[in-house]
Amino acid sequence: MGNLSGWFIHCPPLQWTLDQLETMMINTIKRGKVPQHIAFVMDGNRRWARQRRMETIEGHSSGFEALKSLLKVCLKLGVKEVSAFTFSIENFKRSKYEVDMLMEIAKNSLTQITAHGDLVDQYGIRIRIVGDLSRLQPDVLETALKAVEITKHNTKATLNVCFPYTSRHEIATSVQSIVKMAEDGTITPEDIDEDIFEKNLLIKDSLPLDLLIRTSGVERLSDFMLWQCHKNTEIKFIDFYWPDFSIWKFFPMLIQYQLQNQPA
């Protein structure tokens, strides 16, 4: 029975139908207001794996597949910027085994994304690694910098991979840069304003954050993009784990966003 249901799900006629439905939904949503900057807090990989009695690594791997699927749909819709909270600085407090495992997944994921030419090249994605890069293992850092270098000339869309990241670190880094500029005489205290502060953030030259989505039912931002959230940012807390986040759950959120942002 399991083999039969698996065949049915992956059979060509059904897959063709799903592809047609996806195209129809994308074309419909594109007629309305599409958020230009979407951020994801990808929470619940470990709990998703435990719920299914799987290894933790399987949860994180499935989470990466969900990100790829959603990223592709975002690009098809014309979203210009996607920010993904892939690893918090706080995650270094986990066991060495899990940290090493997450680093390996991140390295492999970045390699896959940059090697996946039909995604990166077709949609002109520029990858930015945003976070405290000094904490990365040498081989992971090398892969991250390579992804940035390979895609630096792309201008159609931006993927901010927040890894390892917290807003507190980002804000502290901006303050340190401004203090150094003042000490060097590059700026005076009177020059310091919001624009100077934003120009020294790790996530700089970004579009306003339109939509922030967090999975797993937890209703907090967990130190993610606190400066970038503004009065018009819509924040959605959804009650399922990240690996279960399919495009079919994403489409209704975008339609709801459009209904809530109709011209007066």
UniProtKB/Swiss-Prot annotation:
Gene Ontology CC: one annotated term: membrane
- Keyword NAD listed? The answer is no
Where in or outside the cell it occurs: the entry states: Endoplasmic reticulum membrane
Reactions accelerated catalytically:
n isopentenyl diphosphate + (2E,6E)-farnesyl diphosphate = a di-trans,poly-cis-polyprenyl diphosphate + n diphosphate
Class in the EC hierarchy, top level: transferase
Entry GO MF terms: ditrans,polycis-polyprenyl diphosphate synthase [(2E,6E)-farnesyl diphosphate specific] activity
Name the cofactor(s): Mg(2+)
Q: Which CDD domains match?
A: Cis_IPPS
Q: In which pathway does it act?
A: Protein modification; protein glycosylation
- Assigned keywords, A-Z: Endoplasmic reticulum, Magnesium, Membrane, Transferase
InterPro entries noted in UniProt: UPP_synth-like, UPP_synth-like_CS, UPP_synth-like_sf
Stated family: Belongs to the UPP synthase family.
Provide the function of this protein: With nus1, forms the dehydrodolichyl diphosphate synthase (DDS) complex, an essential component of the dolichol monophosphate (Dol-P) biosynthetic machinery. Adds multiple copies of isopentenyl pyrophosphate (IPP) to farnesyl pyrophosphate (FPP) to produce dehydrodolichyl diphosphate (Dedol-PP), a precursor of dolichol which is utilized as a sugar carrier in protein glycosylation in the endoplasmic reticulum (ER).
NCBIfam families, per database record:
uppS
Return the PANTHER family for the record. Answer: DEHYDRODOLICHYL DIPHOSPHATE SYNTHASE COMPLEX SUBUNIT DHDDS, DEHYDRODOLICHYL DIPHOSPHATE SYNTHASE FAMILY MEMBER
Q: What is this protein called?
A: Dehydrodolichyl diphosphate synthase complex subunit SPAC4D7.04c
